[in-house]
Amino acid sequence: KDAEKMLLDRNLSLIAERYNIDKAQAQVTQARLFDNPVISLEQNVYNRLNGKYFDVGKEGEATAEIEQVINLAGQRNKRVRLEKGNKEIAEHQFEEVLRTLRSELNKTFVEICFSTRSIGIYDKEIESLSLLMKAFREQQNKGNISLLESSRLESLLLSLRKEKNEQENNLVNLRGELNLLLSLPAGQDIDLLLDDDILKQVDTAAVPFADMDNMLSVRPDLKMAHSNVTAAKANLKLQRSMAAPEFSIKGMYDRAGNFINNYFAVGVSVSVPIFNRNQGNIKSAKIDIMQNGKEEEYAIEKARMELYAAYNQLQKAVELYRSSNDELEHNFGRLIEGVNANFRKRNISMLEFIDYYQSYKETCLQLYELKKDVFLAMENLNTIVGQTVFNY
């Protein structure tokens, strides 16, 4: 939860995406504005009656005109509704980016925790084997241990160190991804805590598939697909209103150029929609509605398929985990000490010794993989549903 809060506050991609909502709100504000009036002024350059240039007196000719466009058929309100729909899409897009980043954060979190534990297994084996090697070198110098046996142990130790190095390189990459998500400086490691006891409480039967299918409606991408249809319908209404005639009123003053001096008049102008009735844009808007409708249907079907696969994946991961025995992890140190003691006493051969080391290591790593798979399956299901179904 702390990591998710840092993601909300610090992630640069999320902050950048949030600006799209502000931009969409600005477009709503813009759509509410009325058209500006147009003012025209005209002054005669040369008065032939008195020979004056730019005569601004009573005998000089000057005109002034003001014109205001008035939108008909509710064009302004329809444009506002369209921009509100676009803002809603921007909000859902932000939620979708957040859903994706949160999933990436949680999966990286789980990967780091289990990668760290895997390195701990290598550390224990390397530490134990290093102590054994020190004792063997002393015996080798006394001639009690053959060079072949010592070489086999050195080879095993080198192999473990190489595998550990690969795990550490992977951990560095995962830490880098986590720091990028949380906008932390490179190399800054934060402590991560993951409670395994939660795995014993996971019960898929408590949340039936049908219930989760009903939860899909809150998914941001599905809400965005629906908002696209709504915005397309709003656009069709706007385009139809744009087919209405353009109407404007104007007032005019003419000082000395009309049939009387100081002439005042008002007028109107109306476009005649004979040729252009916005047919092309109306048809395009209708097609856009059908297109977005099909895309919404596809998004819903895709979400249901993803949910079905994720639900089954979690069930299988939980079933496989519960069929395993995690006691080996807790008894790991005691088991290794027992193997070392038996090997020193020659109760087991070199091949058996190496096999025990490899088997214990592989079993512990596989157990971590089983646990990790359950956590990742829970996170995948949470992401697909669009809300937290399983807490951890």
Model-predicted regions and their roles:
Residues 1-111, 147:
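Short flexible linkers and secondary-structure junctions
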Residues 1-38, 43, 69-70, 144-146, ...:
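Bacterial Sec-pathway N-terminal export signals of envelope proteins
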Residues 1, 40-72, 79, 193-205, ...:
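Small/polar, glycine/serine/threonine/aspartate-rich low-complexity segments that form flexible
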Residues 1-4, 186, 366-392:
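Acidic, low-complexity, intrinsically disordered peripheral segments
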Residues 16-31, 97, 101-122, 131-133, ...:
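Amphipathic alpha-helical coiled-coil segments
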Residues 80-84, 147-156, 350-358:
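Short, charged, amphipathic alpha-helical segments
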Residues 97-214, 310-313, 317, 360:
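Periplasmic alpha-helical coiled-coil/stalk elements that build and connect Gram-negative outer-membrane
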